[in-house]
A protein has these predicted regions:
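Conserved acetyl-CoA-binding loop-helix of GNAT-fold acetyltransferases
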Residues: 68-71, 77-90, 110-114
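Conserved GNAT acetyl-CoA-binding A-motif
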Residues: 85, 91-103
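Conserved GNAT-fold acetyl-CoA-binding loop/helix
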Residues: 6-33
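Conserved beta-strand in the GNAT
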Residues: 44, 50-58, 65-70
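Conserved beta-strand-loop-alpha-helix junction that forms the acyl-donor binding cleft
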Residues: 76, 99-109, 125-130
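Conserved acetyl-CoA-binding loop of GNAT-fold acetyltransferases
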Residues: 113-121
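A short helix-loop-beta-strand connector motif used in the catalytic cores of GNAT acetyltransferases and
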Residues: 32-44, 65
Length: 140
């Protein structure tokens, strides 16, 4: 299963690297062992018998961070990303939800804004990639 997840992440992140104009994109270098040893929770979305999307969740008592949300390019623009974000909102009772993406990743930014996230700040990574952090506060 970890190998399927790794292949899916690489297919999706290859597109994001192009969108960001990134020559050195760390998610594309993630080793198989990293998926297998992760303390985070992974969820998959299957379509037509294929792993079409997946997300990695880092859940804490008061906050839930969507560490990664990827959709295979063959399944782009089908509402799968929104379905996964909604799954998180429905299944985690956090006060705060966060997610990050490359600042130039228009499709991801659009998705997160439509799902009720608000931009909190932008920053530059050590690899020269401009990122944006989004947050959604849940009223308790």
């Amino acid at each position: 299963m970890a190998k399927q997840i790794q292949l899916l992440f690489r297919a999706s992140y290859a597109i994001e690297a192009q969108l960001l104009g990134a020559d050195d994109f760390p998610p594309l270098k993630r080793e198989l062992e990293s998926y297998m040893q992760s303390k985070n929770t992974f969820y998959g979305y299957y379509s037509e018998g294929n792993l079409a999307a997946a997300m990695e969740i880092d859940a804490r008592p008061k906050s839930t961070h969507i560490q990664s949300l990827v959709v295979h390019p063959d399944y782009f623009r089908r509402g799968i990303g929104r379905a996964l974000v909604n799954f998180v909102f429905e299944n985690y009772t956090s006060e705060v939800f966060t997610v990050e993406t490359g600042a130039a990743n228009g499709p991801a930014t659009e998705l997160y804004l439509k799902c009720g996230f608000e931009e909190r700040y932008k920053y530059n990574t050590d690899h020269g990639i401009r990122k944006v952090r989004f947050q959604k506060q849940i009223k308790v």
